[in-house]
């Protein structure tokens, strides 16, 4: 599902700005029942991104209240979100990342309009919600059946004519694999889970990245697909098993050879930005705990990473800013990203 906010332009305008294609065959993935899509937003190229990770606490009681049709929409909860958005503006960040299950579905229009106005990207988990057989969200749960866990990827863009008008693109990703504990609660209350076997690869400011929601990250098959393509990988979580996911995210940064942004509930912690370097410098930022909701900020240097990746091993081992790329890492894809031609290659056949 995708939505464009503040946009009254023609469909031709949208086609020039937002391009989407099924790239499953181009990734040469063995048939695993998943569909892989590339979504490209035509925005000005950036050599680095300033990332803000939200250190916020998720409350299990809010999840239970959803299942009991008694959702928490207290004003204090909205004020917490508002404070984070003000911090994002104050710190002049490019992308704000929040954990799984954080924002109520009804508040997404607030985020998309904020994103468009301030040209700040937002990736956040959407609080569980329940639909009936027609896919509607009713007031009563008499006819309800499925519980949804969505990730919202909100990417802003301008009209391409001097930035006179600002817009934002919203993509809602349905979680592909629910955690066992999550399923236990959902089925225990008499519902079934809604899932969809689709994984997206985004291109925004010529930065390429997939987004994973917590338990999805445990799939070796899906997290390995984007090697050479991903400049960064985003993982939003609500996860108690911090050590297991810590091992995954550290290995992933080296195996895929990209920056990894992991955001978890602050009471479990290990929210961080990881880079493919030696262990001493691996974490650009890392945090756990705290009673106040805050944003931690760090920049990732996309140009520096690509310039390193395009070198052969003999030069990489002498340049110690990163660890060497793994075997079969495709440097031709890196060159295409540097030249900003990768999206044309991935999408051209679909559009022809």
Model-assigned labels for residue ranges:
Residues 1-95, 102-103:
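N-terminal, active-site-proximal structural segment of metallo-dependent hydrolase catalytic domains
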Residues 72-76, 98-102, 186-191, 209-216, ...:
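Short, flexible loop segments at the rims of nucleotide/cofactor-binding pockets, characterized by
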Residues 90-96, 203-207, 228-233:
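Short, surface-exposed connector motifs at secondary-structure boundaries
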Residues 48-70, 172-174, 207-216, 234-236:
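Active-site-proximal beta-strand elements of phosphoester/diester hydrolases
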